[in-house]
Amino acid sequence: MDKVVSSPTEAVADISDGATLAVGGFGLCGIPSVLIAELQAKGVGDLECVSNNCGVDDWGLGLLLAGGQIRRMVSSYVGENKEFARQYLSGELEVELTPQGTLAEKLRAGGAGIAGFWTRTGVGTQIADGGLPWRYDDAGNIAVASPAKETRSFAVASRRADGSTVTEEHEFVLEEAIATDFALVRAWKGDRHGNLVFRTTSRNFNPLCAMAGRVTIAEVEELVEPGELDPDAIHLPGIYVQRVVELTPEQAADKRIEKRTITPTRDSSKEGV
């Protein structure tokens, strides 16, 4: 089945106000920047977005945030976006902060049809006990706080250094899976059937977001014909992808660097002094 659509505009045509979106990428690596820009131009609003980050002030999801198009974020690391902090603290934006590994597993579980899972991450904190500020009012008071989650003790076996096994009781918290109306992802390569290959860091969250979306839209830097991708090299099978958008060379090359770091040039004239 050929899943290629003619343009980003066509790809996001049925995303409407109030939709929930899982958006791939890690930092600015592998973010579906073209699809995000299309949503910005479309003016769709009241969105709930699930993403590890929220872009920066002028790129990625930061564009939707600046336009007031996002109502709620479920995220892990958001410290690079000043507008995000302003909207959160002023009560304009609701934020559910989630541990990064937990967020990844919630997305994976949603894609696998698993309702929830038990984890030790967050036990003994506001993640499990509740009270984490989700939304402030305009006076800086907590208007909406996270609810307490179900916890339970399980016997966990572990192996000691001497080879013996010990069983201990540990407390776990129940985390519910995440499934969204749509998922937006970016792939390095993809074929017309929606099979995708991600490059380096962009593989961190893109496959998981794609799994969690009921309708997954992938923008691909290079489109190939079915059969050209090595089956063993495919990171995400096409069963999870409903639409594919081929980027132009200019769109594929338009990538931002969040923090530019370089190695200082070595002054060889001072060596051996």
Locate predicted features.
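Conserved alpha/beta enzyme-core scaffold
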Residues: 1-273
